[in-house]
Amino acid sequence: MKQQLLLLEDVDGLGRSGDIVTARPGYVRNYLMPQKKAVIAGAGTLRLQAKLKEERLLRAAEDRAESEKLAEALRDVILEFQVRVDPDNNMYGSVTISDIIDEAAKKNIILTRKNFPHSHYAIKNLGKKSVPLKLKEDVTATLFVEVSSESSYVAVLNQQPTQEEPAAEESN
């Protein structure tokens, strides 16, 4: 039998702070209660619920403003990567989410894996790509990534060795 709970914190896949939800007893007993993420819903928790919802609305407004500010800042940012390529411009490896997060951190942009809706995103071609991001409070943004070759390869044609001219002609 599922139990009704009042969430004290946001829980992925279950609900947000201040919501009354139902969950299985094992999940409640083994995870939510020991982590202090929920309390059993009862008559006395209604005041607590109102307080939590008010705090959540304030936090949501702050998070939304912060996310919109970050989305606005990301419009002008292009992360540049230089990768090794073979003579046919095929990349060795790929540019992964971890690479993008590290490069963004160098430009004082804090991103996490949660910001990428496609968890296995990898860029495997040269050129300019747009990477979709999901920020807090359902704000979306686009990050531009430009991947170019590390150095331009020059194809050197094998030329046949030229025959050396005789150094000195014999004079009689």
UniProtKB/Swiss-Prot annotation:
Keyword Repressor recorded: no
Keyword RNA-binding: yes
Domain of life (superkingdom): Bacteria
Any coiled-coil regions, as ranges: none
GO biological process: translation
Keywords: Ribonucleoprotein, Ribosomal protein, RNA-binding, rRNA-binding
Family: Belongs to the bacterial ribosomal protein bL9 family.
Protein name per Swiss-Prot or TrEMBL: Large ribosomal subunit protein bL9
Summary of the function given for this chain in its UniProt record: Binds to the 23S rRNA.
Example of a GO cellular component annotation carried by this entry: ribosome
A GO molecular-function descriptor: structural constituent of ribosome
Species for this entry: Chlamydia caviae (strain ATCC VR-813 / DSM 19441 / 03DC25 / GPIC)
InterPro entries (alphabetical): Ribosomal_bL9 (IPR000244), Ribosomal_bL9/RNase_H1_N (IPR009027), Ribosomal_bL9_bac/chp (IPR020594), Ribosomal_bL9_C (IPR020069), Ribosomal_bL9_C_sf (IPR036791), Ribosomal_bL9_N (IPR020070), Ribosomal_bL9_N_sf (IPR036935)
Cross-referenced NCBIfam families: L9 (TIGR00158)
